[in-house]
Amino acid sequence: MTKKIFATGATGYIGGDAIYALLSASPEYEVSCLVRSGAKATELVARHPSVRIVDGTLDDLELLEEAAANADIVCNFAHATHEPSVSALAKGLARRQRPGHGYLIHTMGSGTMIYDDVIQRRFGEHSDKVFNDVEGLPEVLAVPDFAKARGAENAVRDVGVKNPDRVRTAVVCTGSAYGPGRGLVEYRTSAIHELVRCTLSRGHALQVGAGKSAWRNVYIRDLSDVFVKLITHATNDEQDSDNTDESVWGGSGGYYFVENGEHVWGELARAISDEAVAQGLIQGGDIESIDAAEAASLAPMCNFFWGCNARVEGRRAARGLNWKPVGPPLVKELEVIVQKEAEKLGLS
């Protein structure tokens, strides 16, 4: 029986690349995508003629629940903090009548791990603390629910715990994604791109405080490979491992930090500055130290992105899915990222 997949966020950067990777690998899937824009729906179908459009938004909760109930695999690539929509998807999967397990794959960032820095108002400082998604998972899940994303995450994990014979779940926490997307969005506005934009518009690079905070990152196509591997595993409805450290799906496992590198924000600022100078876009190589409040005024939430530590280590994808990232490191993509931001600013 052909598996039915329902996806939200398919016109975005992460979701768009994942759908491209999935249908390139397995065009036989029956994929339905929630899309609110008629123009984007037309463009998505033009790229993927087999995709069925579900016209609606994340606020159409009954629509989401019904779509999930009629699917085998639900992929939430949309708003990670929109708890009502995630809960509706979970509720729909819990009542589905199709044979086999229903699967819910939820995407979010790794920003929940900045809790200590935020509470202590510690910005731009180094932290030795590194979270991992296998042996360290209990510690990860014990981080207080201060972030809006935690509510949606808990809704995902709860439906799997309460319905173990019917629903399996995976939470995919991505590092800062970079690289050219193959969906409708080639490059998204991320904290990395915002740092480049501010560097070009101000004529010099900047960092928060001492610039020693660090964040993990991941090449977009390597990230999509994780989604394809999860969906393939779900399609086969394979038996999950009883070993918590190797389990693919929720309960005691099913939690993934997906990353293939780390950037220290001050070091990244220097690399951006060097690239911008090399392209003749700025004159000097000075790096300005700013405080968290100014960072927030320059780019939304970038006081947290540029100033806090989200140091995580992904182990589960390699163990449970045999995932091996092969994409170029972030520094190799800076030339193109700087060029793209310069074009947006009319500098090239």
Curated annotation (Swiss-Prot):
- Pfam families the record matches: NAD_binding_10
What pathway is it annotated to?
Answer: Mycotoxin biosynthesis
Q: Which UniProt keywords apply?
A: Oxidoreductase
Q: Which organism is it from?
A: Acremonium sp
Family according to the record: Belongs to the avfA family.
Tell me which InterPro entries the record gives. NAD(P)-bd_dom, NAD(P)-bd_dom_sf, NAD(P)-dependent_oxidoreduct
- Domain of life according to the entry: Eukaryota
**Any idea what a deletion of this gene does?**
Leads to the accumulation of a shunt product in which a double bond is introduced between C5 and C6, thereby scrambling the existing stereochemistry at both positions.
EC number in record: 1.-.-.-
Q: Which GO terms describe its molecular function?
A: aldehyde dehydrogenase (NAD+) activity
The function of this protein is: Oxidase; part of the gene cluster that mediates the biosynthesis of UCS1025A, a member of the pyrrolizidinone family that acts as a strong telomerase inhibitor and displays potent antibacterial and antitumor properties. These compounds share a hemiaminal-containing pyrrolizidinone core fused with a gamma-lactone, giving a furopyrrolizidine that is connected to a decalin fragment. The polyketide synthase module (PKS) of the PKS-NRPS ucsA is responsible for the synthesis of the polyketide backbone via the condensation of an acetyl-CoA starter unit with 6 malonyl-CoA units.
Cellular component GO terms, alphabetically?
cytoplasm
Q: What is this protein called?
A: Oxidase ucsJ
The answer to keyword Glycoprotein applying to this record is no
